[in-house]
């Protein structure tokens, strides 16, 4: 029986050429699997037909937008996931979803191999292969670009030789990855970290200086899950899409950073994530209102570690799964509304309300109606400062 390979297919040059290359090198049949994570661009049916025209024996399209929003983006919002305090894990979140579908397709079609088009310098090779090792360790992984020296020039020559239906005349100077949660741009002139980004590289966001009028929005959360905009109930997918539009129109969510890659190098990345940044900012503020101080302090550490695990390709690890449960528990009272003004590239919180609020006006006010017993402060301070007081008295005695 002929072996089968499941290929993570994007419709681009490298993975289109990989179909024929894998067939020639291994003699295996190639099944192309393309996952719709809300990246937009070409129609998915056009991509499917291209895979077949390039030699795939079967081409599968999975509409995973709802799944991506519910099972990957929402947990990231609940975890306030910002790698290095800035990057909302745009690409990193989609990789375990793609891995899950690749593993399912491999089982369904009886494949013995899985292939991807990642290079040997990026994080994605690790995310794909670590995920596959966790879900389907029996599979052999092929990486033509990394392991077989498939350069762009070689890929173009192969496509022309075989008459593959791929437009190879247009080449963006950038490497771009995008999905529902945002857009990542790298390489080209951005590799000189002194060069400022130009407006041409942006697609999800307008120039922050252009909109004259601000946009006010009220975001509703239920147990940390976004459930409504301006009082209208919507799915997480619809909310992210709408905030991509509205926050993007105000230039919100532009990020230009030098990032510590998993593979040991620093890389300059430009991101656009208008919906993600708006939702994470709103969620953080609602946590400030509804989560007790010690839990909030510890959750900040958990959130950071959760983001690092996802960035590092360990979505399916025991630690990440355990942290998921903690984050869900910590979000059980994160229910309420956050009002924000979107303008000038910023999403600014201007109001908060929650039935689960820990903010007590009568305890916080300095006006009449204050119920805080200030006479308790002196005793509290004496006890709170006692360990440091005793230690310093000892140090003076011994010096």
UniProtKB/Swiss-Prot annotation:
It is an enzyme of class 6 (ligase). One of its GO terms (biological process) is argininosuccinate metabolic process. Keywords: Amino-acid biosynthesis, Arginine biosynthesis, ATP-binding, Cytoplasm, Ligase, Nucleotide-binding. It comes from Thermobifida fusca (strain YX). Pathway: Amino-acid biosynthesis; L-arginine biosynthesis; L-arginine from L-ornithine and carbamoyl phosphate: step 2/3. InterPro entries: Arginosuc_syn_C, Arginosuc_syn_N, Arginosuc_synth, Arginosuc_synth_CS, Arginosuc_synth_type_1_subfam, AS_cat/multimer_dom_body, Rossmann-like_a/b/a_fold. Pfam families: Arginosuc_syn_C, Arginosuc_synth. The keyword Zinc does not apply. One of its GO terms (cellular component) is cytoplasm. CDD domains: ASS (cd01999). This is Argininosuccinate synthase. It catalyses: L-citrulline + L-aspartate + ATP = 2-(N(omega)-L-arginino)succinate + AMP + diphosphate + H(+). Homotetramer. L-citrulline binds at residues 87, 123, 127, 175, 259, 271. L-aspartate binds at residues 119, 123-124. It is found in: Cytoplasm. Its EC number is 6.3.4.5. Its main location: cytoplasm. Belongs to the argininosuccinate synthase family. Type 1 subfamily. ATP binds at residues 8-16, 117. GO terms for molecular function: argininosuccinate synthase activity; ATP binding.
């Amino acid at each position: 029986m002929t072996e089968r390979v499941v290929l993570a297919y994007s419709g681009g040059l490298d993975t289109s050429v990989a179909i024929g290359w894998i067939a020639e090198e291994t003699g295996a049949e190639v099944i192309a699997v393309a996952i719709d994570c809300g990246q937009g661009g070409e129609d998915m049916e056009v991509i499917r037909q291209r895979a077949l025209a390039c030699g795939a024996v079967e081409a599968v399209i999975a509409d995973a937008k709802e799944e991506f929003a519910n099972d990957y983006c929402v947990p990231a919002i609940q975890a306030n996931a910002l790698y290095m305090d800035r990057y909302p894990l745009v690409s990193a979140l989609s990789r375990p979803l793609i891995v899950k579908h690749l593993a399912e397709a491999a089982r369904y079609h009886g494949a013995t191999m899985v292939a991807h088009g990642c290079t040997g310098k990026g994080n994605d090779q690790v995310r794909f292969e670590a995920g596959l090792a966790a879900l389907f360790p029996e599979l052999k992984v092929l990486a033509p670009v990394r392991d077989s020296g498939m350069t762009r020039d070689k890929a173009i020559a192969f496509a022309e030789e075989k008459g593959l239906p791929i437009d190879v005349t247009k080449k963006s100077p950038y490497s771009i990855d995008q999905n529902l949660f945002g857009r990542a741009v790298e390489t080209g002139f951005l590799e000189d970290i002194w060069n400022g980004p130009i407006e041409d590289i942006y697609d999800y966001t307008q120039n922050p200086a252009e909109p004259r009028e601000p946009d006010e929005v009220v975001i509703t959360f239920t147990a940390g899950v976004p459930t409504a905009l301006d009082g209208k109930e919507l799915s997480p997918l619809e909310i992210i899409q709408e905030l991509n539009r509205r926050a993007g129109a105000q230039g919100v969510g532009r990020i230009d950073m030098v990032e510590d890659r998993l593979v040991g190098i620093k890389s300059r990345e430009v991101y656009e994530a208008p919906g993600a940044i708006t939702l994470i900012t709103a969620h953080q503020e609602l946590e400030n209102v509804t989560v007790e101080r010690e839990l909030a302090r510890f959750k900040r550490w958990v959130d950071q570690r959760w983001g690092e695990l996802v960035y590092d390709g360990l979505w399916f690890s025991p630690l990440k799964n355990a942290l998921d449960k903690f984050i869900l528990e910590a979000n059980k009272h994160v229910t309420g509304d956050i009002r924000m003004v979107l303008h000038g590239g910023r999403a600014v919180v201007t109001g908060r309300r929650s039935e689960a609020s820990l903010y007590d006006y009568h305890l916080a006010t300095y006006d009449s109606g204050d119920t805080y017993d200030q006479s308790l402060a002196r005793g509290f301070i004496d006890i709170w400062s006692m360990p440091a007081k005793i230690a310093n008295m000892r140090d003076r005695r011994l010096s």
